[in-house]
Amino acid sequence: MADNDRDGWDPASGVGLSATEGAAARAVVGRRKTPLVRDPFAEPLVCAVGVDSLTRLAQQSGVDGESGFAIPRMVDWIAARTRFFDDYFNAGQTDGIRQSVILGAGLDSRTYRLPWLPGATVYEIDQPGVVEFKNETMDRLQAQPLADRRPVAADLRGDWAPPLRIRGFDPSLPTMWSAEGLLPYLRAEDQMQVLDEISALSSKGSRLAADTVDDIGELAARIALSRGPRNPVAESDADLGGASSSHAVAQRLQSHGWLSNTRPAPQLFAAYAMPPLAEDQELYRKITVVTAMLR
C-alpha cells in the first residue's frame, strides 16, 4: 500500500473505492435470474457513496451487467467469493461458534442479511471514515442487524486489538475471522502483523478465511489495461500492497498452530456451477482462498 494512503480512507476515496466496486458487483449479481447471493443493501450503499461511475455500475442489469468492472468476470468472482464467505459463516454457526470478526468490513452487509443464530456477536473492523459512513447509511435505511453488531473504528495496519477488546471481544471464545478482499491491499509486513494478531487473540477451535493474490503486480497491471471509461477505482487499485503469496500466508498461520487449506479461485467457480475460465482469464488462477482452524 502506498505510503500516502497511511492516513486512511472512506468508501469514496483510496482503496475504499474498491470495496464500493465490490458492492456494486453484488448489486448486479442480485438482479440475475438465479442469483448466487442476494445483498439487498449493496445498491443503496453504493448510491449513498455518491461516486457516479460506481452508481452506474451498481445499477446495471442484463447481458451488459459486467461492463466497466475492474477485470473480466469480476461479477462472477465477487458472486463466488461472497457465497463462499457466506457459507463459511453459516457453517461456523452450525458448529457452535457465536463470535465473529470481519476485518476490513467495508460495505459488507452480512450482519444485516445472514441468518445469525441467537447469541451471535459480529465485530466489524475498518477505518473510522468507513465505519461512520456505514453506520449513518444503515441507520438512514432503517436497517436492523440480525446479530449483535459491534463496529470497531481502527486501522488494521496499526494496533487494532485494544479497540476490539474495548468493544467486548472475548479472546477465550472460539472466533470466526474473515479477511475478504483485504490482504491484497496490505503490504507484506502488515499482512503478517495482522495474522500474528489474529493468532494472539484466538482460542482453540477458532477459524479464519481470507483471499490472497499470488502476483499482485500482474493484477494491478491487468486492472489498468482492462479499464474502459475513466473510473476512479483504477487509481486506488494501482496502490495494491505487494502482498504475500497464499503459501506465505498459510505458512505463517501454520507457525502459530493453525491447520490451513488453500483453494484456487477456479475451484470456487466450479463449486458454484459457473462457466469455466477462458484463456484470457488466467489471472484468477493466481487468486487463492485460504481457510484455517486453530488446533
From Swiss-Prot:
Binding site for S-adenosyl-L-methionine: 126, 155-156
Sample GO molecular function, one term: methyltransferase activity
Cysteines paired by S-S bonds: none
Domain of life: Bacteria
Protein keywords: Methyltransferase, S-adenosyl-L-methionine, Transferase
Entry's EC annotation: 2.1.1.-
Gene Ontology biological process terms, A to Z: methylation
A matching Pfam family: LCM
InterPro entries documented for this protein: Ppm1/Ppm2/Tcmp (IPR007213), SAM-dependent_MTases_sf (IPR029063), SAM_mthyl_Trfase_ML2640-like (IPR011610)
EC class name: transferase
Database matches in PANTHER family: S-ADENOSYL-L-METHIONINE-DEPENDENT METHYLTRANSFERASE YKTD-RELATED (PTHR43619), S-ADENOSYL-L-METHIONINE-DEPENDENT METHYLTRANSFERASES SUPERFAMILY PROTEIN (PTHR43619:SF2)
Similarity comment: Belongs to the UPF0677 family.
Function: Exhibits S-adenosyl-L-methionine-dependent methyltransferase activity.
Name used for this protein in its record: Putative S-adenosyl-L-methionine-dependent methyltransferase Mvan_0910
Origin species: Mycolicibacterium vanbaalenii (strain DSM 7251 / JCM 13017 / BCRC 16820 / KCTC 9966 / NRRL B-24157 / PYR-1) (Mycobacterium vanbaalenii)
